[in-house]
């Protein structure tokens, strides 16, 4: 398995990367950790003419914390988050998610931005950051725009990124004291993709329940619908076995949140 021929560009700055992407247009792909894009290249699922490598750019590895949000550059790795080298929410919420992504070798190279751009329906960050009401920051030669994840994820393996645009950061709102968060997934063995997964945020009057690994975009339930009954209704069209597994995961996190 070998990829189709391509040109590999290594821009010196983020501005240069954006210019390169604009010039190449739809024939370009961004290369960060390569943990998802690499296999797709080898299988020739994607055949870009140009790859723009960005994981060496300091502008995409930035980490910032304010009273309102934690902002992580797109090239911050899962391993850095799992090791506590970034700010976190609550009692290590983000570190616990990063620590169960695939295997250590993947966590060492894989990035939070790359995971979101790959938009796998069973990706941990896709589900968790939707529950946490995160915002992605996108940049192109036309400027910068910000987008909530439900708007960014337009389908399985599909995002709202346009040609020449790059995801530069993700901003995660801080949570008030007393906020509750739960996350669980069902895998055949550790490190594999989940067959069922759900994340829950309860912060004051806010309730957000996200169900993933459905083969589509995540299901987001809010308010009173962020409940077992709401999940039952939302998953009514699933195969009976898949629905049972998904509802088991949802029931688990709801029970843990109430404990």
Task: Enumerate the language-model features and the residues they cover.
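C-terminal structural segment of proteins
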Residues: 1-259
């Amino acid at each position: 398995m070998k990829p189709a021929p391509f040109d590999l560009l290594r821009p010196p700055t983020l501005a240069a990367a954006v210019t390169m992407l604009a010039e190449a247009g739809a024939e370009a792909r961004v290369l960060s950790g390569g943990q998802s894009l690499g296999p797709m290249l080898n299988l020739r699922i994607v055949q870009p003419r140009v790859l723009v490598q960005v994981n060496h750019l300091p502008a995409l590895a930035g980490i910032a914390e304010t009273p309102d949000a934690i902002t992580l550059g797109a090239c911050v790795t899962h391993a850095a988050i799992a090791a506590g080298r970034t700010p976190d929410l609550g009692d290590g919420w983000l570190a616990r998610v990063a620590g169960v992504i695939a295997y250590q070798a993947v966590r060492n190279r894989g990035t939070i931005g790359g995971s979101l751009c790959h938009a796998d329906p069973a990706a941990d960050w896709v589900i968790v950051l939707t529950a946490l009401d995160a915002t992605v920051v996108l940049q192109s030669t036309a400027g910068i725009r910000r987008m909530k994840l439900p708007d960014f994820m337009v389908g399985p393996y599909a995002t709202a990124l346009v040609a020449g645009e790059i995801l530069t950061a993700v901003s995660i709102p801080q949570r008030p004291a007393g906020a509750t968060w739960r996350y669980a997934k069902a895998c055949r063995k550790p490190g594999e993709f989940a067959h069922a997964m759900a994340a829950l945020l309860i912060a004051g009057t806010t309730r957000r329940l996200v169900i993933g690994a459905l083969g589509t975009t995540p299901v987001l339930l809010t308010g009173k619908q962020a409940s077992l009954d709401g999940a039952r209704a939302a998953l009514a069209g699933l195969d009976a076995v898949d629905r049972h597994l998904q509802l088991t995961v949802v029931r688990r996190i709801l029970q843990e949140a109430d404990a």
